[in-house]
Structure formats: structure tokens, C-alpha cells
Curated annotation (Swiss-Prot):
It is an enzyme of class 4 (lyase). One of its GO terms (biological process) is L-leucine biosynthetic process. This is 3-isopropylmalate dehydratase small subunit. Pfam families: Aconitase_C. It comes from Moorella thermoacetica (strain ATCC 39073 / JCM 9320).
Amino acid sequence: MIIQGKCHTFGNDIDTDAIIPARYLNTTDPGELARHCMEDADPTFAGRVQKGEIIVAGKNFGCGSSREHAPVAIKAAGVAAVVAASFARIFYRNAINIGLPIFESPEAAAGIKAGDEVKIDAGKGEIVNLTRGETYPVAPFPPFMQELIAAGGLMPYVARKVKTSV
């Protein structure tokens, strides 16, 4: 899996309330959630982000309350991947479950600046900053996780597996 795009940067401890504020939790419509994605961290983000772009953040991205709305909002906004120095474990699981690729790399989080163009090679385990000519390590995704992401998340992945096994 290769993902390439322009980066939007955020700091440490971006919690799920900054990703999608609690006042929007009464909706499950992905399009509506996308319109408010990152609203409390950067009110202009949802209007600027383009399909295929990448969020890069510091430590503990997705901390706070466990809400599937957070990765859904990010994915629905068109974000192709999230790179962070570290993730809150529940956010990590929720993101993978809905098919949002996320990559933990403290080196990439420190080196990538807003507007940089990067290429993530999930199989090879590297992030190349095409703007700065730097390469950062990232743990490669095992093949089954690449399949799960490519399927669009856990539910579509399981549905395919069940369908092909019958």
C-alpha cells in the first residue's frame, strides 16, 4: 500500500473532542462529520483539506473519549492517512476498524512540516518526505492489515472473507 499526499500538521495530545467536537455526536452521517473535522484544533481545516491529503501529528493523537466518530470524520473528510509520533490505543483500533490507515513514526512527526508532500510505503515500512528529501522509518503493516485497510475496514473485510468461504 502506497499513499502520497500533502500534509497538514497538528501538535501533541489532539483528543477526540478536537477531532470531532461532542456537539456533533448526535449525527452518524459521515459527510456531516467531515464538515466539522478538526474544528476545535483548526477551524479552517475542513474547508482546506483535499481528498488524499495526510494528517501529521505529535504524541498521543486521538486521546480522550472513545468515539468512532473521530476516525470516521477524518476518513470522510478525504484524509488518506494519519501519521503521528504515537496514538491513543483505542483511536488506533477504531481507525483500523474503519479502514483509516495510521502510521506511528516519531521521526516523521518531528520532520514533516505543513505543506510537505510525502509518500508512505506501508509494505516497505518507510515514509519519504518528497519536499525535504528525508526518509523516516515506520513499522510496516502486515499483509492482513493491508488487506483490511484496502477492504475499507473490519466489517467489509469480514464480509468478503465470509462470502469467499461459503
